């Protein structure tokens, strides 16, 4: 299995269990997810022991929480955040500087294509700003990557967009 981590925060962003494709001329990875409903905290009554009818009225016992959301977000503990268009512009400017500095250090040949492609991609993001939900890694590092969540034209299929150069690949 391959885990994709944010290179700044080291948070796990997604893994290769999803359908992943390169978009924006290889600048971004688009990861397709599914809407899921999960029950958390539910414990099988047979594991508790005792006779439920002899214990008195129901009410005590275990509580279950039902969570509905995008599987990528739930599985990798991504945290929703919000931006105004202006605050996103400020964030993305600082984020691009951080990624550019990292590329200059590790992959200098990627700097020019990244900066050229990023400018185009940011224009596209800002033009469709109202369509996106924003997610950060589990540690909520404000300097880390912000993933974008949108839905396909069918209105049902969620997908997330990640800047490829902001990710590190870890093989498990």
From Swiss-Prot:
Gene Ontology molecular function, alphabetical: calcium ion binding
Gene designation per UniProt: TPT1
Location of the protein in the cell: Cytoplasm
Chain's role: Involved in calcium binding and microtubule stabilization.
Keyword list, A-Z: Calcium, Cytoplasm, Phosphoprotein
Coiled coil (UniProt feature): none
Phosphoserine found at: 46
Protein's name in the database: Translationally-controlled tumor protein homolog
Chain ranges of the TCTP domain: 1-172
Family stated for the protein in its record: Belongs to the TCTP family.
Domain of life: Eukaryota
Keyword Cell membrane: no
Transmembrane segments: none
GO cellular component: cytoplasm; cytoplasmic microtubule; extracellular space; multivesicular body; spindle pole
Lineage: Eukaryota, Metazoa, Chordata, Craniata, Vertebrata
Cleavable signal peptide: none
């Amino acid at each position: 299995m391959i885990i994709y981590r944010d290179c700044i925060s080291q948070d796990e962003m997604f893994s290769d269990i999803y359908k992943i494709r390169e978009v924006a001329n290889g600048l971004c990875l688009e990861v397709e997810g599914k809407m899921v409903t999960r029950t958390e905290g539910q414990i099988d009554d047979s594991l508790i022991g005792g006779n439920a009818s002899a214990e008195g009225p129901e009410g005590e016992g275990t509580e279950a929480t039902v969570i509905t959301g995008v599987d990528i977000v739930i599985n990798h503990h991504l945290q929703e955040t919000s931006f105004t268009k202006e605050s996103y512009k400020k964030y993305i400017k600082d984020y691009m500087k951080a990624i550019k500095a990292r590329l200059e250090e590790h992959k200098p040949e990627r700097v020019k294509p990244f900066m050229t492609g990023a400018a185009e991609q940011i224009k596209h993001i800002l033009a469709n700003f109202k369509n996106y939900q924003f997610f950060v890694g589990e540690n909520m590092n404000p300097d880390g990557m912000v993933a974008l969540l949108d839905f396909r034209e069918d209105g049902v299929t969620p997908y997330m967009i990640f800047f490829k150069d902001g990710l590190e690949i870890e093989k498990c």
